[in-house]
Swiss-Prot record:
This is TOX high mobility group box family member 3. One of its GO terms (molecular function) is chromatin binding. It comes from Homo sapiens (Human). InterPro entries: HMG_box_dom, HMG_box_dom_sf, TOX_HMG-box_domain. Residues 528-542 have a biased composition (Polar residues). GO terms for biological process: apoptotic process; negative regulation of neuron apoptotic process; positive regulation of transcription by RNA polymerase II; regulation of apoptotic process; regulation of transcription by RNA polymerase II. Induction: Up-regulated by GPR39 in neuronal cells. It is found in: Nucleus.
Length: 576
């Protein structure tokens, strides 16, 4: 086999690029040291290169024809294969050059290089495969010590792919490596992660298909990436934005809740306390009111409590009426919405039925549907655009056609006769083959209409019931209000009667007092005076002036007392 190579550029060997070393798939021979360049597949098994290139010192731009090199003979397995292990052990030794030395940086042996063609002349030899598989664990630790460079790795991949495409290697002796393996390995190696080295696979697994170890590596990488993504997404999902709670707007028509007895007392006394102490704060005022409330008696507290109870009763009544109005409004709105929907459904169903009734029978009659253009051209615009459909027992359609006065007579008669004949001729056909779909559709429409009517009746009944309930509630409220008003009126009348009774009692007491005063006065006047005459005469004569003299004074006093009592009674009645 002929191997063609290109000599390196003139200059020092130190300027040699690592990409050039990988680009020619061979080894350089300097000072009796043989270095083999071996490529690794997904399972990290080494192949011995069959195509080898010798890098000689720069002697110009000459080209040399080198005879093919035969592979070394198989070594005896009993000798431990020392000849095969020597080239792999020489990888760690530095390469001697002219005047200086350099150490090439090889990529790690665990790297999977895709789309790289490798010669397989020597792969099928069991001895070489066995020796390379056994020596992998020994040489792997030495080769993995070299630090990789991403730029050099990518450059070497490009050179190798170019060499494979240019046809340096024969296509019959080439195998390909899976591309997804390199993408996974490159992504992890360039990122700084070190992938675990896989064990070498047996020689039977050397084929164009990817090895199971590479698929395991891909699955591990995918699982690691998914775990990282889930860990990053976990704290983000834990923080949920708090939705602000919207406060419901109060209805102005809703009745207000009643106030407690203490609040009523506070309202009554706050103004007085503020008037006495204008500079007092709200806290001081509240303290004063609290002390006053504590000092109040039970009777005074009961007055405020009664007021609160009455306010609570009125509030409950108003709340019941308010809720009943809300229920009636909601029911009315739902009834309106349902009526609108039912009307829309009925309109849509009527449109569908009219279209079906127009289309299906006309399609059965060939004579009527055969000449629509001639009818449109011959008949004027006075003809009705839509025919009237009537449900006949024979499933016939009666079309109303209005013939204008200016219409020629030779068109109208044949038209009517043809329509009559077609209708008469189509009657038995419709009896024999009726349109089942239209009948089913009509039945469905009738059922829907019946259901809608039932729903409407139910809604009307519900509305009537709600209206009756509302009227009953209003009547109850009116009755309660009337009863409350009557009770208040009766209480006022009772109070007025009690006042009148009290006034009468006062008048009686005053009259009794007046009578007592009169009696006392009369007794005082009737006392015996000094004896100027005989006692009998004095007794007879003395009482006469005594009795007659105080009469006008007593009458005046009684009239004054009566006038005062009348004025007091009138003032009290006017107040009440």
């Amino acid at each position: 086999m002929d191997v063609r190579f290109y000599p390196a550029a003139a200059g020092d060997p130190a300027s040699l690029d690592f990409a050039q070393c990988l680009g020619y798939y061979g080894y350089s021979k300097f000072g009796n040291n043989n270095n083999y360049m071996n490529m690794a597949e997904a399972n990290n098994a080494f192949f011995a290169a069959s195509e080898q290139t010798f890098h000689t010192p720069s002697l110009g731009d000459e080209e040399f024809e080198i005879p093919p090199i035969t592979p070394p003979p198989e070594s005896d397995p009993a000798l431990g294969m020392p000849d095969v292990l020597l080239p792999f052990q020489a990888l760690s030794d530095p390469l001697p050059s002219q005047g200086s030395e350099f150490t090439p940086q090889f990529p790690p042996q665990s790297l999977d290089l895709p789309s790289i063609t490798i010669s397989r002349n020597l792969v099928e030899q069991d001895g070489v495969l066995h020796s390379s598989g056994l020596h992998m664990d020994q040489s792997h630790t030495q080769v993995s010590q070299y630090r990789q460079d991403p730029s050099l790795i990518m450059r070497s991949i490009v050179h190798m792919t170019d060499a494979a495409r240019s046809g340096v290697m024969p296509p019959a002796q080439l195998t390909t490596i899976n591309q997804s393996q390199l993408s996974a390995q490159l992504g992890l190696n360039l990122g700084g992660a070190s992938m675990p080295h896989t064990s070498p696979s047996p020689p039977a697994s050397k084929s164009a298909t990817p090895s199971p170890s590479s698929s395991i590596n891909e699955e591990d990488a995918d699982e690691a990436n998914r775990a990282i993504g889930e860990k990053r997404a976990a704290p983000d999902s834990g923080k949920k934005p708090k939705t602000p709670k919207k406060k419901k707007k109060k209805d102005p028509n809703e009745p207000q809740k009643p106030v407690s007895a203490y609040a009523l007392f506070f309202r009554d006394t706050q103004a007085a306390i503020k008037g006495q102490n204008p500079n007092a704060t709200f806290g001081e005022v509240s303290k004063i009111v609290a002390s006053m409330w504590d000092s109040l008696g039970e009777e005074q507290k009961q007055v405020y409590k009664r007021k609160t109870e009455a306010a609570k009763k009125e509030y409950l009544k108003a709340l019941a009426a308010y809720r009943a109005s809300l229920v009636s409004k909601a029911a009315a709105e739902s009834a309106e919405a349902q009526t609108i929907r039912s009307v829309q459904q009925t309109l849509a169903s009527t449109n569908l039925t009219s279209s079906l009734l127009l289309n299906t029978p006309l399609s059965q009659h060939g004579t009527v549907s055969a000449s629509p253009q001639t009818l449109q051209q011959s008949l004027p615009r006075s003809i009705a655009p839509k025919p009237l459909t009537m449900r006949l027992p024979m499933n016939q359609i009666v079309t109303s056609v209005t013939i204008a006065a200016n219409m020629p007579s030779n068109i109208g008669a044949p038209l009517i006769s043809s329509m009559g004949t077609t209708m008469v001729g189509s009657a038995p056909s419709t009896q024999v083959s009726p349109s089942v779909q239209t009948q089913q559709h009509q039945m469905q429409l009738q059922q829907q209409q019946q259901q809608q009517q039932q729903q409407m009746q139910q809604m009307q009944q519900q509305q009537l019931q709600q209206h009756q309930m509302h009227q009953q509630i209003q009547q109850q409220m009116q009755q309660q209000h009337f009863q409350h008003h009557m009770q208040q009126h009766l209480q006022q009348q009772q109070q007025h009667l009690q006042q009148q009774i009290n006034q009468q009692q006062l008048q009686q007491q005053l009259q009794q007092r007046l009578q007592l005063q009169q009696l006392q006065h009369m007794q005082h006047q009737s006392q015996p005076s000094p004896r100027q005459h005989s006692p009998v005469a004095s007794q007879i004569t003395s009482p006469i002036p005594a009795i007659g003299s105080p009469q006008p004074a007593s009458q005046q006093h009684q009239s004054q007392i009566q006038s005062q009592t009348q004025t007091q009674v009138l003032s009290q009645v006017s107040i009440f």
